[in-house]
Amino acid sequence: MKNIAKKDLFINNEIRVREVRLIGLDGEQLGIKPLAQAQAIADDANVDLVLIQPQATPPVARIMDYGKFKFEYQKKQKEQRKKQSVVTIKEVRLSPVIDKGDFETKLRNGRKFLEKGNKVKVSIRFKGRMITHKEIGAKVLADFAEATQDIAIIEQRAKMDGRQMFMQLAPIPDKK
């Protein structure tokens, strides 16, 4: 009953089977009953008869307050959506020959992303003959990682991919 959507449930007069395995209000088994008798029991208790497992033989029906059940189900779904956190990866692009002022600006942007709880992909694109000096790019990435070590951990070390070197930083869990 945990992942039941409205389209899966048949209620009261929507049920089109001859007999059902009936479950009472408190979850007790009431046995196999003809549909008319099961609906009469539900009507006497002023609640709904809900078909919860139509594929079973015989189908399983439960006596419950459907409005309350639906409300509780929606409430649980809402809570689960609240608990989900969407982790986005923001990218900061650098150059191997980046100037100090530009580096500070990119660093400030990267820190903002990390403080908001986002992961940051720091990438360096090598153009032309710069690719022969990969150590310069590695130093720039190391400087970036060192400058953010108080709020971030290195999730993926510096790595080459074609003409691009990148690393990924994640915020320290308790600093979110």
From Swiss-Prot:
GO terms for cellular component: cytosol; membrane. Pfam families: IF3_C, IF3_N. SUPFAM superfamilies: Translation initiation factor IF3, C-terminal domain (SSF55200), Translation initiation factor IF3, N-terminal domain (SSF54364). InterPro entries: T_IF-3_C_sf, T_IF-3_N_sf, Translation_initiation_fac3_CS, Translation_initiation_fac_3, Translation_initiation_fac_3_C, Translation_initiation_fac_3_N. Keywords: Cytoplasm, Initiation factor, Protein biosynthesis. It comes from the Bacteria. Disulfide bonds: none annotated. Belongs to the IF-3 family. This is Translation initiation factor IF-3.
